[in-house]
Amino acid sequence: MFKSIVVGTDGSPTAEKAVEKAAELAETLGAKVHIVSAYEPNSVKVGGGFEERSQWMEAPGSTVDSSIERAVGMLRVKGLDVESYARKGNAAEALMNVAEECAADLIIVGNKGMTGAKRFLLGSVPDKISHHAPCCVLIVRTTG
């Protein structure tokens, strides 16, 4: 059935529930788990005078790293096969790209994500994935 599961994390309580569900399914089915965290690159002004340009910083930062480390630790304690990915860009795109790369059978996400202006500009991660994923999708419902 499901042998390769992709799950997204950003360190939020909603993402933690998604990781827990991925662990539960992976344990039951003997599946490998691919943990993905996405980050937006920081834009920094470089230069001066007439020609200012933006330069992208490649480092994902400690927030993404710690989110991934916590999720990986949670799964490895259970003896699960885990691989992690920190990807630059939109969270939904990052999850779907990893799912394609590893031929995933399932993507798991929480039902809540970005809020406010960021959600308005980029859209809901669960919504985008549910409409465009290359595989089955499980949206974990959280309280609230």
Where are these regions (language model features)?
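Small/aliphatic-rich secondary-structure junction motif
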Residues: 3-53, 74, 78
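Short, hinge-like loop/turn segments at secondary-structure boundaries
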Residues: 50-54, 101-103, 125-126
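Structural beta-alpha unit
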Residues: 73-107, 144
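A short acidic, glycine-rich active-site loop
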Residues: 52-66
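Short secondary-structure boundary segments
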Residues: 37-38, 110-112, 141-142
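Conserved beta-strand positions in the Rossmann-like core of class I SAM-dependent methyltransferases
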Residues: 34, 83, 138
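Glycine-rich, Arg-bearing micro-motifs that act as flexible, cationic patches
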Residues: 109-131
